[in-house]
Regions:
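Catalytic centers of nucleases
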Residues: 1-38
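Domain-level recognition of nuclease-like catalytic cores that cleave nucleotide substrates
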Residues: 44-70
Length: 70
């Protein structure tokens, strides 16, 4: 089940703070820093990014990705 609680997405028992960016220029580290700050330690920070005429990409820390695989 997926639920949206304010800026927090809850899916499969895990909470994610999703930061969406739609821009031609993209700084992954700056976007991740913003997501980490906004998540405030209560959720896994995730950044979604899209450029014009390109598919969406998802950026997350490796340690968080590996935890999802467990």
């Amino acid at each position: 089940m997926v639920r949206l609680l304010g800026a927090i997405l809850v899916a499969g028992g895990a909470a994610f703070h999703v930061e969406c960016k739609r821009a031609e220029r993209f700084n992954a580290y700056a976007a991740m820093e913003q997501a980490q700050h906004d998540a405030n330690g209560h959720a896994v920070p995730v950044v979604m990014h899209r450029r014009n005429r390109k598919p969406w990409l998802v950026v997350m820390r490796l340690k968080d990705f590996l935890a999802l695989l467990k």
